[in-house]
Amino acid sequence: MLYKLLSSYITLTLLFLLLAVGAAIATFIENDFGTASARALVYDHLWYEALLGVLALNLLAVIHRTKLYRFKARFLFHIAFVVILLGAGLTRYLGNEGIMHIREGESASSFLTTKPYLQVTLHEGTSPRTHFFPLEITAWKNRLQKSLPTQSTPLKIALVDSFIHKEGLGVSGYFDLELLHKEKRIKKRFTHNLASSLQKETLWLDDLQVDLAYGPQEIPLPFSLSLKAFELKRYPGSRSPSEYTSHVALVDPSQKVALEETIFMNNTLSYGGYKFFQTSYDMDEKGTILTLNQDPGKEVTYLGYALLFLGLLWNLLDPTSRFRVLLGRIKKDSLSLLLPLCLLSPLASSLYAQSDYLQGYLKEHQKGSQELSKGFGELIVQAKMGRMEPLNTLNREILYKLSGKSSFLGMSADQVVLGMLSNPRAWQGVPLIRVKTKPLQELIGIHPQNRARFNDFFDENSAYKLQKEVERASTLPPSRRGSYENDLLKVDERLNIALMVFQGSLFKLFPLPSDPHHRWLNLKESIFMLEGEEAKTLHQATALLLDSAFERQYFKGIEALQTISFYQYKKGNEVIPSESKLQAELLFNRLEIFPHLTPAYLVLGFLVLLSAFGLLFFPPLASHRVRVSFHLLGWILFALHTLGLLLRAYVSGHAPLSDTYESMLYISWSGMLGALLFFRHSLFALSASILMAGIFLFGAHLSHIDPEITNLVPVLKSFWLTLHVSVITASYGFFGVGAFLGSFALALFILKDHLKTPLDKPIHQLSQINEVSLILGLTLLVIGNFLGGIWANESWGRYWAWDPKETWSYISILLYALILHLRLLRPKHYDYLFSLLSLWGFGSILMTYFGVNFYLAGLHSYAQGDPLPIPLWVYALSLALALLSLIAYPHRHLQNSDKGNS
């Protein structure tokens, strides 16, 4: 009976659900009450660990009952999870981790634990006795009751009260201890916060001295580390760290070992079973903070990872695997195409009414400044975080921030910014600043126009019209800000950017000679800080450039640009990128590949989708030539997409996976690649992939996602991170395709009972294609997650931190594993159920990707506890999909494939 229960697929399903729901609840507990509460109630609690243990037993029992060991690939990746759980258990129960702080010229032979302890020292007789009790205060019941023997009556210690308050990513609060010895009773309060320092108190209970301490426990090491020097490198002209290194000496007298090593991010020191990681440093840059761990489970865990990766990849190649069998069926059931025609028309634009002078100036500036502006954009500028880039890149970011466009009134970003810099008074009268909401337009006095002039924001007394409203909106938590408040704060930011352009403070164009940090100066700073004949020539050239643009004698400014460029290369050549990188970045900016790809993907996706539906009703219209044409168009768009990613990677110096914008570009790319390689025989799958690519690109260019190219922080400079992010985000593309295919199938369920055309077979084919997509997605998601474990362990010594993003990724694995194993339960109406779950399962991916970033506080998050309001379109889309699911339900029966084993 027990064996039957353990080897049941129903047990497996329940375990997946319980583990996923428990982890999901824990992420919200952590957001509201802190990490310690989430760990105490879920992750570290016996009930959750017991579920993981039962899951391991369930896997072993299922493997034995189904004789899965006969199929080597499937056996390898299933048994790998058991090995990984075993390694995790060894690390959790036998491992140790802590923090070591060393100042330059000093040494340390002990470390502090990451978890807090209550330390009780009893002074009796000749030697005091110290007891350690782990005590981490959480939002729920905290228990501590101890009875310690003394020479007379026992000392009783109890925790009687506690309170915590969430503050950003941390918590603060207090707890009260009550001590009883003989007839003496004392109550003592300790504060609880993120500080690692030890809190100490000495109490007397009659003749018994008791020393209490709360904080990390100090653990001695059999060797010592001394810090010879700490080195911090920053990005040019910036305070942002590029790399920090600890030069240490290790001495072990017992083994007669003395060696010198360097520790920096992603480069560790291993000795005596301990591994040291560079974590942080003192603000005066004279001390280092290292984390260390002792991990007896590492070899077992890495063995599990190796088996997992080998098994999953082998499974994709194994001709007997579910993946290859389905792929074979899809090829046999190839669908043809129908080509509908469609006409596109350009959008018209209108000019605002302006004064005769301003209209004349703008018209002349548009025509006459093109050559000068092009050279202006080719100057080098030091941007945020010290990134060196063509001025054209910064100009484009400025114009996009101000107007939401990459060009304005027929002028390039370089022309606009040069005009604002050289003739601020004229440009303060140009309606350039975007204002979305009607109440704000009315407050400024521009309604019904949606663009405001700089001058519109000030009344006749030069008072800022938005001052009070901005102050009010700034004090509101994000969850209480409506569209008006959000637009208000964004417009205020745009106005400040415009002001900085007019003042020239954004443009760090001039290298400061002999500066150790390679700092560059803006226009105003250069006047006061650059001296000598060269500086005088430079100032004259700058004045000539601005005067020539102001007087509209643009040819005069060409020589001035050459003088400025010569000075840049002479004084700042050490940090200026190569000519090939600069030209590549200018080409990348000029092509605007991703904004142009967005409508192309969407239009092509809808054309293919219309063709797929048309084929169901007019099969004779199918054409091999049309199918090939669609595929060729898909490959052309994919090639352009690939070119854009390669250019961005080249100019940034790192893989384009470092932020939300870049990862969305990559997700859409991976979805297209999967469709072109695996789904070329299905129009529905091809259209789903193309639409998914277009929607992700569209999302990447929404106003709250920043496309700016930036330098990497030190911890992100890792091969394992690049591999982890690229693989895991690629999986999102396949899950997105699965969600689209699920929605298409549900739509066909609704249509099948109202049309004469039989749709049962196409629905079943869609389910098979969908399953292939989800298998690919889950394979990549699992591999990507465990590659992330390798990166985290090699970077700071912890595979898994139960951070909300990690946790929701783990939840996604559980949910999609459940969806793909659902057929083993042989449910009725399997195709409907599978389509439904593949659609709604994508919600876990969206939560992993967007929800955690903006609604939960964590290491991967942009939120700090106050969530942003959920956009109305999310509710509308959810309602529409819910209606689709409900309307399809009465039509869920198919004639030939009701069981999941079909």
Curated annotation (Swiss-Prot):
Entry's transmembrane regions: 9-29, 75-95, 300-320, 335-355, 602-622, 659-679, 731-751, 772-792, 832-852, 868-888
GO molecular function per UniProt: heme binding
Cell compartment(s), UniProt: Cell membrane
Any single GO BP term: cytochrome complex assembly
Keyword Transmembrane in annotation: yes
GO annotation, cellular component aspect: membrane; plasma membrane
Cross-referenced Pfam families: Cytochrom_C_asm, ResB
Membrane topology label: Multi-pass membrane protein
Keywords: Cell membrane, Cytochrome c-type biogenesis, Membrane, Transmembrane, Transmembrane helix
Family: In the C-terminal section; belongs to the CcmF/CycK/Ccl1/NrfE/CcsA family.
Annotated function: May play a role in cytochrome c biogenesis and may be required for maturation of the NrfA protein.
Protein name in UniProt: Protein NrfI
Native source organism of the sequence: Wolinella succinogenes (strain ATCC 29543 / DSM 1740 / CCUG 13145 / JCM 31913 / LMG 7466 / NCTC 11488 / FDC 602W)
